[in-house]
């Protein structure tokens, strides 16, 4: 049942890290769609792999759809996307499972300056609204990074998406 089981997750940078994570029982792995990815999938055959669509790598929702399908064809279970709602909605409408992101989003860190997000009531409401917008756009998962635990708990209880907490 949602919110009852916690699944260990990590981000890996190479195949050896993927193998070590998988052998340690880590069930959710995120990685980049680089030359190591096919080996990562081979070494972690049943792990849930969320593979990143680099922010700015594509310039239109149509390019994102094409690239998303390429990532899925390589063996990903979901495509990580921190692009705008328009990109996420277009990809989701085509059946691409999307892992979205709220809170501290490193590639958008100029907005947050690498700090916890959601500590004020106004910011917490903005984070929660962003989650609802992502859910309405069709995202399957949301990575909630460096937000207060109370905000993360509220998000988990009030969305149908899979929530992945980092630093919460």
What residues fall within each predicted segment?
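Alpha/beta enzyme core
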Residues: 1-168
């Amino acid at each position: 049942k949602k919110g009852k089981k916690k699944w260990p997750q990590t981000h890996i940078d190479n195949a050896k890290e993927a193998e070590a994570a998988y052998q340690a029982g880590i069930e959710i792995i995120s990685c980049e769609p680089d030359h190591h990815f096919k080996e990562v999938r081979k070494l972690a055959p049943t792990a849930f792999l969320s593979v990143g669509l680099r922010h700015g790598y594509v310039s239109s929702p149509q390019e994102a759809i094409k690239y998303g399908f390429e990532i899925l064809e390589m063996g990903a279970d979901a495509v990580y996307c921190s692009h705008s709602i328009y990109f996420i909605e277009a990809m989701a409408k085509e059946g691409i499972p999307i892992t979205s992101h709220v809170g501290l989003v490193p590639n958008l860190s100029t907005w947050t300056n690498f700090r916890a997000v959601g500590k004020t009531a106004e910011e917490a409401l903005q984070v929660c609204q962003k989650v609802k917008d992502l859910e309405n756009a069709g995202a399957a998962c949301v990575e909630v990074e460096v937000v207060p635990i109370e905000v993360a708990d509220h998000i988990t209880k009030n969305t149908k998406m899979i929530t992945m907490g980092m630093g919460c």
